[in-house]
Amino acid sequence: MTATHLLSPADILWKILEDYGYDAEPIFLKEGIDHEMISKPGMRISHAKAESLWNKVAGLIVDPCFGLRGSKFWHPSHFNALGYAWLASSTLREALVRASRYAHIVGEDRETRLEDTPEGLCITLSDSLTLPPLMDLAMSILISACRLNYGEDLNPVAVYFIHSKPHCAKEYYSYFNAPVMFNTGSDKLILSASAVDKHLPVGNPQLAKINDQYIIRYLA
């Protein structure tokens, strides 16, 4: 079976292109994608098409840090019911467990691994995100989503990237506000145990359960 990806997150890439002054529509149309398709809830595309689109965009935008701009344009609805289940989670750990359990709603080749370490909870992102800007996008949205639930004062203990250090590395240091390492063995970030286990007033177990049930039906 061919792996597929949720199409709605492509809206983030569309907006990044526009932010750099590009007309996104013809770029997407070359891949057979229009904005009406992106706006259709639950619409999916093949892994090959998603990869081709990302490679085209990476070839157009000169700035190697463009993936970090995803944090400006993402919305929980881009990730279907997982985004809303995230918002309703009572702790960051609960939200991250959901993101790990239901990662396939975003991409059937996606995997998020969680591990408790002496430094805190380590979140390792999927090996399938081999294109550096795509990993940057995923990592920037992850910490943005954590800050959305927890508060803007949340900073990781440390952030690690497999890809090499770009000339714009200061943008990583500024955005994550934490030690950022490049040329490492895995793409991961660490959050303190006190942060991930803090009870959050935004939590709503009933709403979280409703969205969990929707995700389970969607993935069935």
Predicted regions and their residues:
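Short hinge/gating elements
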Residues: 79-85, 126-129, 196-197, 215-217
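Extended mid-to-C-terminal alpha-helical interaction segments
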Residues: 174-220
